[in-house]
């Protein structure tokens, strides 16, 4: 059965579905509280260093600066059985964020000496840096299963302290010591540059590693006050990496590119990101900043930046039916075998105008490339930019091809595209587009239900967004009665729903989208003994679609603290008064299996136990023997068996000059001696060849 073409779904044309009947009871996984990492740990009675850092004795007074505390670019991990199922899925999603924005990768442990063991401990915590202890623990406990929390804890493991502990902290924030819980004042200490390196990156209020303003408070007043008041509600964000987080991480690990990112283009530069026009079409895509019939501005800047804001436009009003304009991306080289193409489309022409997405894939047998149609898009003109995702499965060198095709209908405008992003990630399964969004924030009418969607397994579902609260927006996932219910397993087992409020930044690497995941537990029961995720026709309440069709909706599962209204109005969550919520529901039942446990490789620590490397040298094993790998900089280095000797460019120059002078002096001496000996020998030879004039000969004359 084609899940996307079910008969009862076709006539649901409304984007917002608001039930006129009673809302079923929602289960709030956060208990109505917006708890940060430190609130969770404090509530558990944990007294960890800086709230979520586990220290060993050797680390208490030692720096983590130095290569020996770095992990390899591919980090081995184990997801322990103690982890909740939802946490396992969230951790894997967090790894995808690392791959998209950095060169850091993660792989299941295969016997490597050092690896990260992720388990459900008490609270959320990690050590800082690679402790080289073999199994290094990282806890994702109850209520820690948020993607940015996982990113935060893994940044600790990668070698990062909290942002507000850097040495220049007091230039940017004020610590209100009298408002801090007694005995927790040490969590606000700062550390010198020889303990924690800021990597020459400015102080970052937006860092995912920064405390919130309420951290360790003994009342209701903030413990941290930003010296620039605009950042008061910015610090402590738990959405995603900030730009500076990424800058520091990529510097620390010498990342020159990220793993799964492929391309991004907002057409701000005249070279249009290396895209090329086809010579075999009838028209061209034009780089413009506005079109009389729309759009009036690009999507990147929405007309807010004078002198910038461009997009590509195919004018279908000036060509004949069937005419095409073809724009091809630069050549791209895939590594993973799956990609997601994302872009915005504006149709100001006819609803019969069409955008076709092709892939031109190259091979040794076909150097011109094989053209394959991937997606045909026909859109009713709506007067706004529309977001699209297209799934690709390319394994060879390729180009993405955008073909605009003139339809049979009358056109006064054409097709426009902007903000293209391509990455080797999975596309979301569905997009919930909410127009005229700001009217719902804090309004009694701000309770919205999405259209019905289907998961890849065939489960029907809806999303409930509650914007009516004064300070926070809530989001909940509901199963609803659907066409496949007779063929599905009930209670619904281990389906993870990921709901992402999209940050519409033009570059996917700079987005800080807000994401929350929940997982259906088939064993979860309600107070009356029913299974929470049982068939909606059995446990749900009656509801109505906007066209009057009756269905049943199961209980909601989510959070009332999805995002604050203040954060919702920040960044590019709302753009052109449009909001996009990306939805993915996937089966994660395979994560129930125990990860294969292997025998650890021979310990490097054992082989290096009798080898002491000086000057931050790192002991490594080569050909079964321990040796020191010495530190080096741009103009200095350590050398010797134990890195005990220091060398520098200056020393080398001095040695080179001294050697040159010595050689010159030696050659001069040799030359002078040679000249002296030659002259002496010449005089002796001349003396022996001179005639012997005696007195007798003189008398002969």
Curated annotation (Swiss-Prot):
Reaction(s) catalyzed by this protein? Hydrolysis of proteins, including azocasein, and peptides. Hydrolysis of 5-His-|-Leu-6, 6-Leu-|-Cys-7, 14-Ala-|-Leu-15 and 19-Cys-|-Gly-20 bonds in insulin B chain
Topology versus the membrane: Single-pass type I membrane protein
List localization entries: Cell membrane; Secreted
| Signal sequence segment | 1-22
Q: Which UniProt keywords apply?
A: Cell membrane, Disulfide bond, EGF-like domain, Glycoprotein, Hydrolase, Inflammatory response, Membrane, Metal-binding, Metalloprotease, Phosphoprotein, Protease, Secreted, Signal, Transmembrane, Transmembrane helix, Zinc, Zymogen
Q: What is its EC number?
A: 3.4.24.63
Annotated region described as Required for proteolytic processing, given as residue ranges: 595-607
In this protein, which residues make up the domain named EGF-like?
604-644
Q: Fetch the PROSITE patterns from UniProt.
A: ASTACIN, EGF_3, MAM_1, MAM_2, MATH, ZINC_PROTEASE
All copies of domain MAM, residue ranges: 260-429
What does the record say about how the cofactor binds?
Binds 1 zinc ion per subunit.
Q: Which cofactor does it need?
A: Zn(2+)
Write the protein's name: Meprin A subunit beta
| UniProt organism field | Homo sapiens (Human)
What lineage does the source organism belong to?
A: Eukaryota, Metazoa, Chordata, Craniata, Vertebrata
